[in-house]
Design a protein with these regions (language model features):
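Active-site residues of response regulator receiver
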Residues: 8, 55
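Two-component/phosphorelay signaling modules centered on CheY-like receiver
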Residues: 11-32
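Acidic, metal-coordinating helix/loop segments flanking the phosphotransfer/catalytic sites
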Residues: 33-51
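Acidic catalytic/metal-coordinating carboxylates
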Residues: 36-39, 62-65, 83
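Short amphipathic alpha-helix used as the core "switch/output" element in two-component signaling
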Residues: 42, 64-75
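As written
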Residues: 49, 63, 75-76, 95-100
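Receiver (REC) domain active-site loop signature in two-component systems and cognate sites
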Residues: 58
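Interdomain helical linkers/hinges and coiled-coil/dimerization scaffolds
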Residues: 93-95, 99-163
Length: 163
């Protein structure tokens, strides 16, 4: 199984992402959820997940700080950012340090699947350790509608068809 962590200072977002996709069907195990950057960074160092799905703006340590430190330590974790910030500087900094992808909130399920696929199928990236055959062409399992407050729901569970 591929190990992945989630980090966002809004727990409803991490819970929603957990329920958005049938991760187990993709061969991915979510091994931790974190609400601040320091805890997420400690988990990356301690658990060495193949994938870290991070909010770019968190208390304690920003996502850019995390990827900068990971880059300096030559961590093998693929980092995907999820952010409400559309400023070019955030995306540029993230990509300069080797982020696999930078997704804007509201996260679109299909875009998240494509970002995860990049992590799993990208041999030039040092973090790929999974040798199995994962099928990303399907729907990764149909999910029932997730109950979250109406004001937050659109932030993480739209599909491309709804745009």
């Amino acid at each position: 199984m591929i190990k992945m962590i989630l980090a966002d200072d809004e727990p409803v977002i991490t819970r929603g992402i957990r329920k958005l996709i049938d991760w187990e069907q993709l061969g991915i195990q979510i091994i931790g959820e974190y609400e601040d950057g320091k805890s997420a960074f400690a988990a990356i160092l301690r658990d060495q997940p193949e994938i870290a799905l991070l909010d770019i703006s968190m208390p304690g340590m920003s996502g850019v700080d995390i990827i900068r430190e990971c880059h300096g330590l030559q961590c093998k974790t693929h980092i995907i950012f999820i952010s409400g910030f559309q400023e070019f500087e955030y995306a540029k900094a993230a990509l300069d340090y080797g982020a696999t992808d930078y997704l804007l909130k509201p996260v679109i399920r299909e875009e998240l699947l494509k970002a995860i696929e990049k992590c799993v199928k990208s041999p030039e990236q040092p973090g790929v350790t999974y040798k199995g055959n994962i099928d990303f062409s399907g729907d990764a399992g149909e999910q029932e509608q997730i109950y979250v407050p109406v004001c937050v729901y659109p932030m993480f569970c739209r599909s491309e068809k709804e745009q």
